[in-house]
């Protein structure tokens, strides 16, 4: 249903730098911690295990009374939240590698009186950080457009701006989640229960599981705290009555506060999905993402959808409906709707969308491309901003090749537009390499921690030839442009420069700052080109970044290209772009994935088009000849099984829905684990949304969105993948073209080691 009426915003007030503010206060759900340090006070109630300490994290030289001390033994390089004595606690997995000077403490990488590697020492020595006579809380100093060892916040221009790359300090801001308890009726009187382990939970943490039936007192189900997994199968439930499940962490033999409960209704059907009914039906094209919109520690679902088909700029068809951005609770409650209007054509290239807490208030914002005619969640319409007397820029073919374009940020709680700025300028359509809009209309967005601590917004326009990337910060209710980059391809039409139909983010070179990755091309956090394969016909649809080759240090990239050439399918070193191995292709490889799917092997297995349907090991050797998952359109991997190998989905559904399949390495074949049934549509998201560390599958039907979750008992446990910075960033790409799937910044698979604690700090209240 299209909104009609409501107030019209005719442009708002233009501030410095062309930023248009549309009013409305930014969410005030919690102050932003700059670096995670508490400047005084003692934690007197005990540190929340896995959450923020509400009484202040170990004041300088102070102690935490009743708190929990988490040093190197409670998870690789755990954070000392109970204070540090002389010499301090040594963080072996974080930014400070030498401990704290006498009586000092390390909070977010700032060493007070000690030596910080990558941080700033107040009166101490600094290696790779910004020392400006005091301590840098949360990373390099970012003030007024100058760059002190980090990212320039005022500079812009071709190639970007900024000083020398250094090692970042300071913990990354991350969502403060609840335990994400889920209960699924498996039939036969069995209920599967799963929950989250947080990124900063101590390695020794255990959990008790409780069930309250029909409102009676909760009963503990396990004999001793569960430490091997974060799931449990309840074989004694009376499913004819309602059952509320919760968990309670156990640390050092002491039970902590209980989680929020998940209630399985009486006579709940034996199905392994949550149903989110669409406010109105007719879904034809959809993509989805998740974020904690209201700061309650639970993910909400943001669905971008249309009754029109998914229009590709290269094979244009006229959109028959506008695109909606709907927000829902996972219990199906509708929250709000943004109608993007007729100037945003129906299709993933036209409507990039992000869901992320970009201002550090503990609540996710929704960020998308908009134009005149867009209606926000409170009914306010963007009006005639340029005074040309029109707000509909469709031509006779239904294409939109002119008119104002914006990036808008919406408040997660109600969809109110908080602020907007101009999108990357279209200029002349032919600047991008054609006259039809195929290239100028291909647009992407992402989130990257360019200073190593705070999320920045990345917007990108153009593939094939001319490409422009910009970086923005949204802090304190204002947008500021950090830098702009372009590849110098303006007006070129024949060449395919290094590019991809998707973006990925990650710390490619290990300096603590994120890079922006475009397949055969990487941009440094400063906005400079980090490396470029400088390929002719260098464009591809998919690529993936992770620890794909465990024997090597650092990250690798598996990428594919669209045109016949040597190394058209290749593994690269993410820090340098060096080709580690490659395969010659005779045409468009179309798709490609790299993930650990064969439990007999170690590292990633790789599959793609144009390589004879072979399955390759991480080093390029063929391990299954002509029978890879690519045969029969089995593509996107998902963590679904009990162990650490990934299963494989049908990315595109057939008549009987989306399948999840287990790969059998010995026979080079697939075994079906689950199928979603007839009428289901294309996969929208694969991410760790609920329960334990394994992933959920989000798919669409004409009238509902379904969130499928595994009920296979786990054989091990990990902290939630959403607390791994690189995984979380790349899940953020899921409501865009060729989202693929995400990988953490550690090796996850057969023969893995316990992953180090992530270098994060929670933003928002504990849950």
Locations of the language-model features?
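Ser/Thr-rich, Pro/Gly/Ala-heavy low-complexity intrinsically disordered linkers and tails
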Residues: 1-169
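Beta-propeller-forming repeat regions
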Residues: 171-179, 188-190, 197-202, 216-220, ...
